Amino acid sequence: MASADELKQAAAQAAAQKVQSGMVVGLGTGSTAAFAVGALAQRMQKEGLQFIGVPTSERTAEQARSLGIPLATLEEQPRLDLAIDGADEIEVGSLNLIKGAGGALLREKLVEASAAELIIIADASKKVAHLGTRFPVPVEVVRFGWKTTLARVEALGCQAVLRRTAEGDPYLTDEQHYILDCQFGPIANPAKLAEQLKGTVGVVEHGLFIGMATEAIIAGPEGIETLRQS
């Protein structure tokens, strides 16, 4: 039976085939997205694929540079042909997502909102009937007054905790913000919750990606499954 990493690798390889020479491609962040960056670098070396990557985090930028992928900022390339990224949960049917376990939700959303297509890659464990079933919703907040912001977010119906590093320090995003991991349970109306979170004072961004994914490539024990919005 294939391991989770082998399934992620299979989905990443399938997504990398979508990229054509001349494209500007958003490069996601996280363990699954890292496989896609590696698969694209392989195509550059073996097939002569030429593209420009727009990374969604310093971590992804470092990986891409080490593999020889030419990079640009969102300011330099404000329109992307497609973006490839992972997800923590994928709601079957809507393709609404929870993202942000890798801590890059703000830059991911900025880059991926600028892409004509967003291809999500994942193993089959990430499919859910309702967002919030397994994963918390990451909420990026300013550091000033974060406990007050946490209380405001919890008033929306969740239990929120400050994300910390393995050493016990508050986790800092690339933009030097904190992240609250918010357990809502199954979310009946993700679009409404997204609006409520966005309107909460102190919240910079949240990990609900509503209506953004155009396609999800899911790798499972029986092969590759492609999901589209229904």
From Swiss-Prot:
Query: Which SUPFAM superfamilies does the UniProt entry name for this protein?
Result: D-ribose-5-phosphate isomerase (RpiA), lid domain, NagB/RpiA/CoA transferase-like
Q: What is its EC number?
A: 5.3.1.6
Q: Where does substrate bind?
A: T29, G30, S31, T32, D85, G86, A87, D88, K99, G100, A101, G102, K126
Catalytic residues identified in the record: E108
**Its pathway?**
Carbohydrate degradation; pentose phosphate pathway; D-ribose 5-phosphate from D-ribulose 5-phosphate (non-oxidative stage): step 1/1
Pfam families noted in UniProt: Rib_5-P_isom_A
Signal peptide start-end: none
Check the record and name the Gene3D superfamilies matching this protein.
3.30.70.260, 3.40.50.1360
Q: What class of enzyme is it?
A: isomerase
The answer to keyword Isomerase applying to this record is yes
Recorded catalytic reaction(s): these are: aldehydo-D-ribose 5-phosphate = D-ribulose 5-phosphate
Q: Which UniProt keywords apply?
A: Isomerase
Q: Which GO terms describe its biological process?
A: pentose-phosphate shunt, non-oxidative branch
MF GO annotations = ribose-5-phosphate isomerase activity
Give the protein family: Belongs to the ribose 5-phosphate isomerase family.
Write out the function statement from the record.
Catalyzes the reversible conversion of ribose-5-phosphate to ribulose 5-phosphate.
Per UniProt, subunit arrangement is: Homodimer.
Name of this chain's protein = Ribose-5-phosphate isomerase A
Which species is this record about?
Synechococcus sp. (strain JA-3-3Ab) (Cyanobacteria bacterium Yellowstone A-Prime)
Top-level taxonomy: Bacteria, Bacillati, Cyanobacteriota, Cyanophyceae, Synechococcales
- The gene coding this protein: rpiA
